Amino acid sequence: MSLKNIVFDLLYRFGKPPWVIDAPQPALMAAVSQGVIRGPAVLDVGCGTGDNAVYLAECGFSVTGVDVSTAAVALAERKARTLSVKARFVPLDAFQLATLATQFETVLDFGLFHQFAGATRARYVRALGEVCTSRGQLLLQCFSDHGGKARWFGPRLVSQEELRAAFSEGWRIEWIRPASYKSNRGREYPAWLALMTYTNSE
């Protein structure tokens, strides 16, 4: 486990990260209400404590959530049990998605893409494609640069051009829209919400 992943695991074990809001992200709820999410099988990559995954399961989707943090996965499983929701949670590195041996109609990434850059980002994008069905889709939300300047700490801010470049091969970008992340600190942060269709299987 990398140092960054160890830090995330410690955050889940001994605190409450700012992105844990004990509810689905508003942009995801809007996407569901608009019929954007296709099923039945949905994968939530970097699921954290399961806020989004549990919500999707409540909506009737067959949901698998993965996170590199075993502490986060344990919290997600507890949340699902408490709410009597059926969802599968797996402690797994995002680069090893193919080991799930399952393909999904929709893959969800709400908060992981912006952790990667360069060759690591390209490797991650390939891993996402490996678990998409033919014409499967990716709904991705990442921190954006349209609301501020890059900082020396905190999540990486992503430009729309970076998003388009990362998914220029093997994917068709359906749309990219301004959105926002809700946090448990009473603030919202600028984001991009993007929908992509996997085309390498065509």
Predicted regions and their residues:
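Conserved acidic residues
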Residues: 105
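A conserved beta-strand element that flanks and buttresses the S-adenosyl-L-methionine
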Residues: 108
